[in-house]
Design a protein with these regions (language model features):
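N-terminal and secondary-structure boundary signal
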Residues: 1-137
Length: 137
């Protein structure tokens, strides 16, 4: 079965607010019924917040839209990334003030908070899952 793909074109047919990318993201969020799925849940939003000079990240205005949808649905969102990306996330616009929730390293500040799972696959004997990701509901 093919996956459903959601797409919002950057093209604006008219100079109206509803034609902007943030407004199109709001329509996708509505179609995904995010608000209906998160009540009372701790919701991790995993993303790449950039590293040093990185600029190919999702703009904070879009992240805030997703965060706000989770909050509107009664969820408790937070953003995670790897330690070396989240350390300077505020300098790239990813802060509690701009996106509406905290940004944490997924496996803790020292990258030592994880759960190991024994699930052999080919030459891999175990998998390590970042603690904050596994702990989210």
């Amino acid at each position: 079965m093919a996956s459903k793909v959601f797409f919002g074109s950057a093209r604006q047919a008219r100079l109206e607010a509803k034609e902007t990318l943030p407004a199109k993201l709001d329509l996708i969020i509505d179609q995904l019924h995010i608000r209906d799925r998160v009540k009372g849940e701790t919701v991790v939003i995993k993303m790449h917040t950039g590293n040093n000079m990185s600029y190919s990240t999702i703009h904070p205005v879009f992240v805030r839209r997703v965060v706000q949808a989770v909050k509107d649905g009664g969820g408790k969102p937070f953003v995670v990334g790897v330690n070396w990306n989240t350390a300077g996330a505020e300098q790239r616009g990813y802060s509690s003030e701009t996106i509406g929730c905290p940004v944490y390293p997924a496996a803790g500040p020292e990258e030592k908070y994880f759960y190991e799972h024994e699930r052999p696959f080919k030459n891999i004997k175990s998998w390590k899952v970042a603690g904050l990701i596994q702990d989210s509901t």
